[in-house]
């Protein structure tokens, strides 16, 4: 409908859309002068990368605020650089020190093409990382018919995009989702076959979580091995490996430098720390049982040991979604006398165990928390899991972040009072 517009032109026309950009970087770009071509500031231009897969996008995806499956790439022909309205830079226009800007295509050889074309996700040095993100900047706007092709995640997204294009009169537009285009543009798990995201985005995680909660509610065990939560907790305290998924993480070493213990030992420590928190004792007896079970189970998605080379777990941003089928097996086969609320809470606490920490320290958005809480104790238990998880690794994290944690609690309470 509008093609692509510069930030300033978009603002002048009152066009609003979902923004995944970093505010601090955008402020820099709003003031950074472009020293050639039409001049002005970076926000007077529509930016493109020369590289197919940028460290900036990886950083955005790692914050868990967007689903990479919904990211599309718009490509323009390199000949666009010959237009007088186009400039380019030898590195990103994101840092405190501006890049060098050029308006003569003969200066393209001054860019670090080895870095730009490299398949390495993040170069080892900051300077090379910024050079990899050299930009082509088109003044004001670019009409949609100037694009060469679009790259999308898969055939499903291709169909959706093609329908949108047809709605606006673009029939038979070149939308690509072939394996080579996918491999070159998206951050995917290189250890498995297929199109597997390295981070589960918020929409997919929420949808999967809701589906599994519903499935578990409809398939409560008829002959559970443990009659209730208290029964299974007693068994775990006597034998941590009494549940297969716990046995599969017991002794699982990790190469994550912030962890001092194996995954099983860490899970036991998190559960033991609950008793040190006053908020834990403010919960009802049933809720204390729920959050304790969730603490034991919160890292089961990192297992089993058998999936890791030499039994050493690597950082895995998809472990929350991997826990869902495990939770379904445990709650549908092992544990009886669970209410629907308790099923929802256990699953939510395990899948979103990192949510509070990510919100206060890594810019994960609060809307994700709003979508999973129903009552105040949901908030309290999510915070309990987070605090005990952080304290088990580094007590300074909680000490330094306690004000932000309590402010988050207050905002979630207010949200519940106003909306539910």
What residue spans do the PLM features occupy?
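Active-site-proximal loop/hinge segments that shape catalytic or ion-binding/gating pockets
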Residues: 1-47, 55-220
């Amino acid at each position: 409908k509008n093609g692509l517009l510069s930030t300033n032109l978009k603002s002048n026309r009152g066009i609003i859309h979902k923004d995944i950009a970093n505010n601090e970087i955008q402020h820099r770009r709003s003031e950074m002068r472009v020293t050639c071509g039409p001049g002005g500031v970076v926000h007077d231009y529509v930016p493109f990368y020369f590289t197919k897969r940028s460290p900036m996008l990886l950083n955005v995806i790692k914050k868990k605020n967007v689903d990479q499956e919904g990211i599309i790439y718009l490509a323009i022909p390199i000949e666009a650089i010959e237009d007088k309205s186009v400039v380019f830079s030898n590195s990103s226009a994101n840092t405190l020190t501006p890049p060098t800007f050029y308006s003569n295509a003969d200066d393209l050889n001054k860019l670090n093409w080895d870095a730009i074309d490299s398949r390495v996700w993040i170069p080892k040095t900051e300077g090379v990382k910024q050079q990899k993100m050299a930009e082509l900047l088109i003044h004001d706007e670019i009409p949609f018919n100037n694009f060469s092709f679009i790259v999308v995640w898969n055939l499903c997204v291709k169909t959706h995009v093609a329908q949108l294009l047809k709605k606006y009169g673009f029939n038979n537009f070149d939308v690509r989702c072939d394996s080579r285009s996918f491999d070159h543009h998206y951050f995917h798990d290189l250890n498995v076959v297929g199109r597997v995201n390295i981070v589960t985005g918020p929409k997919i995680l929420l949808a999967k979580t809701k589906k599994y909660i519903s499935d578990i509610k409809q398939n409560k065990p008829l002959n559970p091995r443990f009659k209730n939560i208290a029964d299974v907790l007693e068994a775990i305290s006597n034998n941590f490996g009494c549940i297969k998924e716990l046995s599969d993480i017991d002794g699982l070493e990790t190469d994550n430098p912030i962890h001092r213990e194996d995954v099983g030992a860490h899970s036991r420590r998190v559960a033991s720390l609950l008793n040190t928190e006053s908020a834990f004792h403010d919960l009802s007896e049933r809720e204390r049982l729920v959050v304790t079970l969730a603490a034991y189970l919160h890292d089961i998605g990192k297992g089993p040991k058998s999936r890791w080379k030499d039994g050493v777990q690597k950082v895995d941003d998809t472990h929350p979604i991997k826990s869902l089928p495990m939770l379904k097996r445990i709650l549908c086969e092992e544990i009886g006398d669970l209410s629907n609320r308790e099923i929802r809470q256990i699953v939510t606490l395990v899948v979103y165990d990192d949510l509070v920490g990510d919100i206060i320290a890594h810019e994960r958005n609060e809307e994700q928390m709003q979508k999973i809480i129903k009552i105040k104790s949901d908030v309290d238990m999510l915070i309990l899991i987070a605090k005990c998880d952080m304290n088990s690794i580094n007590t300074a994290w909680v000490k330094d972040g306690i004000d932000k944690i309590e402010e988050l609690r207050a905002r979630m309470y207010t949200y519940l009072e106003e909306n539910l």
